[in-house]
Swiss-Prot record:
It comes from Buchnera aphidicola subsp. Baizongia pistaciae (strain Bp). This is Small ribosomal subunit protein bS6. InterPro entries: Ribosomal_bS6, Ribosomal_bS6_CS, Ribosomal_bS6_sf, Ribosomal_S6_plastid/chlpt, Transl_elong_EF1B/ribsomal_bS6. Transmembrane segments: none annotated. The gene is rpsF. It comes from the Bacteria.
Amino acid sequence: MRHYEIILLIHPDCSEKLPIMIEKFKKLVIGYKGRIHRLEDWGRRQLAYSINKLHKAHYFLMNIEVPSNCIQDLSNTFRYDDLVIRNIIMHVKKSVTEISPMLKSKEDKLDKKDRVVVS
């Protein structure tokens, strides 16, 4: 089985449907006897350029290990789902389980807010 990293951009008005969509994608991966190494919800973020007259999107990251024939089904599912604005599926050499830099930066910002400056 191969390791893949998938980034999804989901329509920002449908963030409440995100858990249902992710569950559907998880069932597809598990149906192929694949494993999910990492799921990260990056939240709503500004797009670099507008896509379909949208300026924001809900970002989601998945690191999975599946047979190569599952990728075609995932790709078709993403392509025909109206709520998925963009997707990218990248083959990676090994599984990635640590927190991504995108989430680390969010945690760093939260840590900075909690700090108290004493002078």
